């Protein structure tokens, strides 16, 4: 990234940076000059003992981009099935077809579920599920068509790169062909799940039956080429190391340079409960905050960094708004995947509660749609300012 001039306010605020870590001072010089950080810089950010200085730098970038604005949305999760052939060691959600607790929603059931929950008009359906060995592509196309017919104003963010790849193999057509069919059915954008960590070594341990990192990235490229924006995630806090994390983010950054199709980066803390990796400890609050900060500093071409309150608790998410995050996600009505892995956060939060959390953190709430456009609410409906 080329150096660009700073505003007087940015120059003045940069003078507040303090640290005894000489390596961080060198990184700060690059950040203030808006020069791109490299792999070694990423390792330095992870290794520095001065986490407050790392957070300060990330917050400086965040406020340079967004000021005090913090984005949130009113969204509902729909998980049509938990039947999955992948058997990932990181997952507590997936089941085999005959397992106790396995389910697959009938289409009418899924459409009905979309209308239940809090009595607030949702602006987004977030749809992800397992890799079901028997469900045809047409099931998912009909699911989306039915939602669009019943809720034409609601943005449908559906199906991870992993799911799209699996559907392509089952239907014996190409990934771009599946994406075109999904888009024609009514999919508006895609979530960022399934990325985990791109390292082959790590994936062999935690998700060896899932597509590799290269295919995940190429599927994202194909989606972006068709005009489908997506998010990007990184699952951390299991068997990966700092090098794996930095490599993951730089590979995302490279694709973003080419496509510009990623909307936000979402670091996801691993929840080990009820998984084959439950012997591993959970991440600490400091680890979560550092990850938010490093993501903000390395991913200079991502507009948004999300502190997903369901994963890190509402309290840590509030602090993360001072460590580089500008988005706290949404109401997340009926989240299942992380709660099966032991998440103790509520399975949803009211719009008013999100607004309160953001204001208590000293930030300004901004209700957005999935594409980060402002949402204007009436008593029981909404419009999007285009």
Task: Label the model's feature ranges.
Residues 39-42, 75-77, 95-101, 128-138, ...:
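Glycine-rich, proline-tolerant flexible connector loops at the mouths of alpha/beta enzymes
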Residues 42-46, 75-78, 129-133, 236-239, ...:
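Conserved short loop/turn motifs at secondary-structure junctions
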Residues 1-52, 65, 118, 250, ...:
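Auxiliary Fe-S-binding modules of radical SAM enzymes
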Residues 34, 58, 88, 127, ...:
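Conserved, mostly hydrophobic/aromatic
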Residues 95-233, 238-254:
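Conserved Radical SAM active-site core
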Residues 70-76, 125, 156-160, 190-192, ...:
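Hydrophobic faces of well-ordered beta-strands that scaffold small-molecule active sites
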Residues 49-73:
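Active-site-flanking structural segment that lines cofactor/substrate pockets
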Residues 64-66, 70-109:
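Canonical Radical SAM [4Fe-4S] cluster-binding loop centered on the CxxxCxxC motif
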């Amino acid at each position: 990234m080329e150096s660009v001039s700073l505003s007087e306010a940015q120059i003045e605020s940069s003078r507040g940076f303090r640290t005894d870590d000489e390596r961080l001072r060198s990184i700060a010089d690059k950040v203030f000059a808006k020069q791109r950080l490299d792999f070694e810089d990423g390792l330095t950010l992870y290794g520095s003992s001065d986490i407050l200085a790392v957070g300060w730098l990330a917050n400086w970038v965040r406020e340079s981009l967004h000021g005090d604005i913090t984005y949130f949305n009113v969204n509902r999760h729909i998980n049509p099935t938990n039947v999955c052939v992948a058997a990932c060691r990181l997952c507590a959600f997936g089941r085999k077809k005959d397992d106790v607790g396995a389910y697959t929603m009938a289409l009418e059931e899924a459409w009905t579920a979309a209308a239940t929950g809090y009595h607030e008009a949702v602006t987004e359906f977030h749809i992800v599920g397992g890799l079901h060995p028997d469900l045809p592509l047409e099931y998912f196309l009909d699911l989306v068509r039915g939602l669009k017919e019943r809720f034409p104003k609601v943005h449908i963010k559906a199906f991870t790169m992993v799911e799209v790849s699996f559907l392509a193999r089952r239907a014996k057509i190409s990934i771009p062909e599946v994406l075109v069919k999904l888009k024609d059915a009514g999919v508006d954008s895609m979530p960022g799940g399934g990325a985990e960590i791109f390292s082959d070594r790590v994936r062999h341990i935690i998700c060896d039956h899932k597509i590799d990192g290269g295919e995940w990235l190429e599927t994202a490229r194909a989606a972006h080429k068709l005009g489908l924006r997506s998010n990007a995630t990184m699952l951390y806090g299991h068997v990966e190391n700092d090098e794996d994390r930095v490599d993951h983010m730089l590979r995302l950054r490279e694709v973003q340079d080419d496509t510009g199709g990623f909307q936000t980066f979402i670091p996801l803390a691993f929840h080990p409960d009820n998984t084959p990796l439950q012997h591993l400890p959970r991440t600490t609050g400091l680890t979560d905050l550092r990850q938010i900060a490093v993501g903000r500093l390395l991913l200079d071409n991502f507009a948004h960094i999300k502190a997903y309150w369901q994963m890190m608790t509402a309290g840590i998410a509030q602090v993360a708004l001072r460590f580089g995050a500008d988005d706290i996600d949404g109401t997340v009505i009926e989240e299942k995947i992380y709660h099966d892995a032991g998440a103790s956060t509520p399975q949803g939060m009211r719009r008013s509660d999100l607004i309160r959390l953001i204001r208590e953190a000293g930030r300004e709430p901004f209700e957005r749609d999935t594409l980060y456009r402002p949402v204007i609410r009436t008593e029981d409906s909404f419009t999007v300012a285009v």
